[in-house]
């Protein structure tokens, strides 16, 4: 089983396919549906270095996951668009995406990583809690978010 995590251009066709699949899954899963125009922005341009990063995951040569980082001011970063294809879940890809993104974030000067998530994304919430994220008060007005988390990245070793 070969899993490769690498930086990608968020404007690439593979990145667009991953993000579209993520949006479609949210549309089908969330009680209120999902319209990306109504959520907190994470446009591809915001996920380009030096103020962002976009990672994709490949399993056996197929692009099966992604996540983005928005570098904000004062050492804050926000994890965005974390998604793994249903066909590749259970292989540890989300964990690898998260850990790899945290390592890149440290190199980019991020000291605290924040994220929000929906109550329907139970596995994601458990992933974040297992990896040291703690519940915080809402830091944005995302209408689809029910939980907000953060993790101090200071002290994480760079790769």
Model regions: which residues?
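Residues forming the Rossmann-fold NAD(P)(H) cofactor-binding site
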Residues: 91, 95, 99
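Short coil/turn segments at alpha/beta junctions that flank glycine-rich nucleotide-binding fingerprints
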Residues: 75, 91, 107-111
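Terminal substrate-recognition subdomain of acyl/acetyltransferases
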Residues: 147-159
